């Protein structure tokens, strides 16, 4: 019983650390791509870039959909609510 409990605990810790690492990587990659985007215009190119980036991240690492979708929704919501001009 104790062996099973310790194994399940270790498995949970590993899964949590992996999800945190992937979320930090996805956030940094989104921020780096956003910092490159500068100028005035519509938000559709930004949305396309974010969509392609998320597609690549999902294919490359297999991140849980719920975590990625929540992060992307926050980033896209911030881009859409912000001004159209400037560096994102």
Swiss-Prot record:
GO terms for biological process: sorocarp development. Pfam families: Coiled (PF05710). It comes from the Eukaryota. Belongs to the hssA/B family. This is HssA/B-like protein 13. It comes from Dictyostelium discoideum (Social amoeba). The gene is hssl13.
């Amino acid at each position: 019983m104790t062996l099973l409990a310790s194994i399940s605990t270790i498995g949970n810790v590993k899964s949590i650390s992996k999800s945190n690492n992937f979320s930090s990587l996805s956030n940094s990659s989104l921020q780096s791509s956003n910092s490159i985007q500068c100028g005035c215009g519509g938000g559709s190119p930004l949305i396309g870039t974010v969509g392609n980036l998320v597609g690549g991240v999902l294919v490359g690492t297999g991140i849980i959909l719920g975590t990625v979708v929540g992060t992307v929704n926050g980033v896209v919501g911030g881009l859409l609510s912000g001004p159209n001009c400037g560096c994102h």
